[in-house]
Amino acid sequence: MVGEMETKEKPKPTPDYLMQLMNDKKLMSSLPNFCGIFNHLERLLDEEISRVRKDMYNDTLNGSTEKRSAELPDAVGPIVQLQEKLYVPVKEYPDFNFVGRILGPRGLTAKQLEAETGCKIMVRGKGSMRDKKKEEQNRGKPNWEHLNEDLHVLITVEDAQNRAEIKLKRAVEEVKKLLVPAAEGEDSLKKMQLMELAILNGTYRDANIKSPALAFSLAATAQAAPRIITGPAPVLPPAALRTPTPAGPTIMPLIRQIQTAVMPNGTPHPTAAIVPPGPEAGLIYTPYEYPYTLAPATSILEYPIEPSGVLGAVATKVRRHDMRVHPYQRIVTADRAATGN
């Protein structure tokens, strides 16, 4: 029908929905504020976060999400200030963390109580400060007189007399619920506080999410199938990109072997052994052996020398009396010898 506004049902207060709202708030705070155009969005987002936390808190403590009547009468008379102290039973339960239970993660539980009751809730007395050294330093100073008292919760409210009494009564009832320790594993408020802390830290995971049916079917099949026990697989060392030394024979011994088998004039040495055929007979080239090719020239001492030459170099040179035959020597006949030609 034209003119009627469509009303949508509000989402249920679940941890996942609260986590989505917190993520939206972080994203909203990271964006620049363009002339205040996001003011209403931030206000609506804060109101929704407060509503979800309030419903979750009521569900945790009261066991239902039914909202208590928050209607207050009209103010009558001047504004007054009322306060009341509720002492924490630390002597009866010395190991219970009442301060963390009342304040909650980053003070969210106390802030939620203040928003719901309209009162200011503060933890005072011995052990109310996290830093014990600072607490001892401030003890006895002005405005720190409460450190000489026992641990207690101070509830204050400012309003008209008739309204302040109602607010204070509601706040006292809610705080008294927090001063009753629950058994380990049955503290629903502690579970909620841990969940809120995980949401704030970004580490929350919903434990109610079930695995797909396919995963269960595969797991059942794997359990029904026979199992074969095998030894652990050997761990191989990582392969190097470039070997430091060549795996095969280097190229220089083969070059020296060929140089030894050849005389300086190019003729094969008579005493040189022929390189046997095989994989080591040819020149082996690998792409990473080029540093070995830059070797100095082979010394002349590596070539074989005749034993007679070595002896002749040491002993005195022997004069030869026979005439060496010259290849171009002319033949002198008797007629030419007589004429002198």
UniProtKB/Swiss-Prot annotation:
Methylated by PRMT1. Disruption phenotype: Embryonic lethality between 9.5 and 10.5 days post coitum (dpc). Embryos show a lack of large vitelline vessels in the yolk sacs, kinky neural tubes, pericardial effusion, open neural tubes and incomplete embryonic turning. Conditional deletion in cardiomyocytes in the adult heart induces dilation of the ventricles and a rapid decline in cardiac function, associated with severe disruption of sarcomere organization. Conditional deletion in neural stem cells leads to hypomyelination in the central nervous system due to impaired cholesterol biosynthesis. One of its GO terms (cellular component) is synapse. Keywords: Cytoplasm, Developmental protein, Differentiation, DNA-binding, Methylation, mRNA processing, mRNA splicing, mRNA transport, Nucleus, Phosphoprotein, RNA-binding, SH3-binding, Translation regulation, Transport, Ubl conjugation. Highly expressed in myelin-forming cells. Expressed in oligodendrocytes and astrocytes in the central nervous system as well as Schwann cells in the peripheral nervous system. Also expressed in the yolk sac endoderm, adjacent to the mesodermal site of developing blood islands, where the differentiation of blood and endothelial cells first occurs (at protein level). Expressed in brain, lung, heart and testis. Changing residue 48 to G: In qk-Kt4; induces embryonic lethality possibly due to its inability to homodimerize. One of its GO terms (molecular function) is DNA binding. Residues 11-82 are annotated as: Qua1 domain. Changing residue 330 to A: Abolishes nuclear localization. Residues 182-213 are annotated as: Qua2 domain. InterPro entries: BBP-like, KH_1_KHDC4/BBP-like, KH_dom, KH_dom_type_1_sf, Quaking_NLS, STAR_dimer. The modification Omega-N-methylarginine is found at residues 227, 242, 256. It is found in: Cytoplasm; Nucleus. GO terms for biological process: 3'-UTR-mediated mRNA destabilization; axon ensheathment; intracellular mRNA localization; long-chain fatty acid biosynthetic process; microglia differentiation; mRNA stabilization; mRNA transport; myelination. The KH domain and the Qua2 region are involved in RNA binding. RNA reader protein, which recognizes and binds specific RNAs, thereby regulating RNA metabolic processes, such as pre-mRNA splicing, circular RNA (circRNA) formation, mRNA export, mRNA stability and/or translation. Involved in various cellular processes, such as mRNA storage into stress granules, apoptosis, lipid deposition, interferon response, glial cell fate and development. Binds to the 5'-NACUAAY-N(1,20)-UAAY-3' RNA core sequence. Acts as a mRNA modification reader that specifically recognizes and binds mRNA transcripts modified by internal N(7)-methylguanine (m7G). Belongs to the quaking family. This is KH domain-containing RNA-binding protein QKI.
